[in-house]
Amino acid sequence: MIFRSSDRPPEGISRREWRRRNLQTTPPVSTADAAPAPVPVAPEPAPQSTAPDLDDNRPTILTVCTGNICRSPMAEVLLRARLEPLGVRVHSAGTHALVDHTMTEPAQEIAVELGAGADAASGHRARYLVEPMLKDADLVLTMAREHRSHSVQLMPSALKRTFTLREFARLASTLSTESARAAADAAGDDPRERLRAAALAVTEQRGLTPAAPDEDDIIDPYRRSRETYELSASQLAPGIDDVERVVRAALIR
């Protein structure tokens, strides 16, 4: 492929990564779901909103899935409803995002039923996952192992703060609130450092809890039945509780 001056990659995407996305015709198939995956929208440059606001110094959580129209925005708006009052910024992105698409209607409806703000759900627009988002995030929560792998490949230094949402819940189940708070206290007063320290404390449980990799993924409901959306939400929702508990332990003194 010959790249013209108009083919410059958008902000936050390396030329190598942009070339890979332009050459790619279909996204990887999720191991958790045999349904058709969303088709990537690589030919058009991603909007400027793909770059995080680096001037925003709030503790930051990033959620990641494939198309950024079902699972990761549902996790985003549910976490935002609970954690924004604590000064936490929550946003989401997709490894093969359907850029500028809204959340699917069932995802919006279920998210609101579970406590998300209606405006936040309807206002979502899908974005590509790019390196600056991962660098800026204090905690990265993916919806499946394939997204965790993709994120760590883009930003290897994010390994110890990147989990699937269900993996985080499984690991956090063996970490007491007091232990999470103690880890945060050891990091000092900066909220972002405190959240990263709590995430590291969860990481350290990886050798202490039974591995259950097949249960670490959340099924992709895209183009599937309402029942599949509800199953996906039922796999996602318990992890929201665990994230909230750990974040509160880290930030509330």
PLM segments and residue spans:
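Conserved active-site segments centered on acidic
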Residues: 2-137, 146-153, 157-160, 248-250
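Phosphate-binding/catalytic loops
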Residues: 2-34, 38-40, 47, 53, ...
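Short secondary-structure boundary segments
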Residues: 144-145, 166
